[in-house]
From Swiss-Prot:
Matches recorded under InterPro entries: DUF2179, DUF5698, UPF0316
Name of the featured protein: UPF0316 protein SERP1448
Main subcellular localisation: membrane
Keyword Membrane: yes
Transmembrane segments annotated in the record for this chain: 8-28, 40-60, 66-86
Domain of life: Bacteria
Membrane topology label: Multi-pass membrane protein
UniProt keyword annotations, A-Z: Cell membrane, Membrane, Transmembrane, Transmembrane helix
UniProt family annotation: Belongs to the UPF0316 family.
Record lineage: Bacteria, Bacillati, Bacillota, Bacilli, Bacillales
NCBIfam families listed in its UniProt record: PRK04164.1-1, PRK04164.1-5
Amino acid sequence: MSAIAQNPWLMVLAIFIINVCYVTFLTMRTILTLKGYRYVAAVVSFMEVLVYVVGLGLVMSSLDQIQNIFAYALGFSVGIIVGMKIEEKLALGYTVVNVTSSEYELDLPNELRNLGYGVTHYEAFGRDGSRMVMQILTPRKYELKLMDTVKNLDPKAFIIAYEPRNIHGGFWVKGVRKRKLKAYEPEQLEVVVDHEEIVGGSSNEQKV
């Protein structure tokens, strides 16, 4: 600690790193608490307080220089970004994506089920007539992949995504096949759909 205190640039670096770590844990703990992951949030809060006790005393006793104040503020802002990025990478929980489409002939519900998603669909009516509405459950890490998939199948589809607070009952979570979701790529979707159509067509011909 004495070596750091004697070198102003080491002090700036120490203040920046300590505050990045502290605010990263603080941001993650806040997000996890809001999402209901209480036990994970408790572990993160332990790390947060540990950094606070060990390092923040050094930081707060060295804010008499302008460069230290700047390092403290910069570390705070970077810590928020880092904490949010880590939480995004962890992608805990599920996302519900609502899709409204007028293209009944595409059979989007079954196409998405074949790709591994849990889908509930029903008919609705808008200004321009009948529409098909789908509620699609997906792990958060595959949310963008699902949206790209829907856009490839129906570029005119109306899409809304939100994160459910709690999930209980039904077959949604069991209906999500994570291995299937991981196996395909949206840009290869046309090949997958064509293959399904070929297989379905050949089986129908054999039955006839």
